[in-house]
Amino acid sequence: MTLFEKVSKYADADIAMPVRKTEKSAGYDMVAAEDYIIPSIWVMFQEAKEIWPVGETEFVTMEQMAKFTKETGCKPTLVSTGMKCKLDQGEWLQLSVRSSSPLKYWLMLGNSIGVIDADYYNNPDNEGEIFFQIYNLSPFNIQIKKGEAIGQAIILPYAVTDDDAACGERTGGFGSTSK
């Protein structure tokens, strides 16, 4: 059974459940669970340069970039939907920003698309709470108000190779499969 539910933290909150707006819509519209200010990436970079001066370099390693991100806080804003999604075996949930978000508001997902695996549901770290990683490419900070549509969730099937031998189990929440 595939279904959306509120996470316990937002059980009594007045948040719209994800819905498809038309009969032929692929995506379920997702809304922000609370108010957020999405900082301008340009402002973040200016502030980050004061904390972590950037020298004349062609590249940094992934380890250096992780340190930069941790020390400066220069990263996408995690916008909660207050929702989780129970998926059947063989399904995954794709998260995408609304098609108007980059065009009108300069908002994009930091990870291009979000991938929610079936075993993310009810994980011990965050109950499977669905977040959108949002970057603001505009020169201004942008406010997203509680209840505003922030993206879409599309339920999709997946396939595995004939020789697939995956047998591990999820041990955490957000980003835990790469830890």
Where are these regions (language model features)?
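DUTPase catalytic domain/fold
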Residues: 1-179
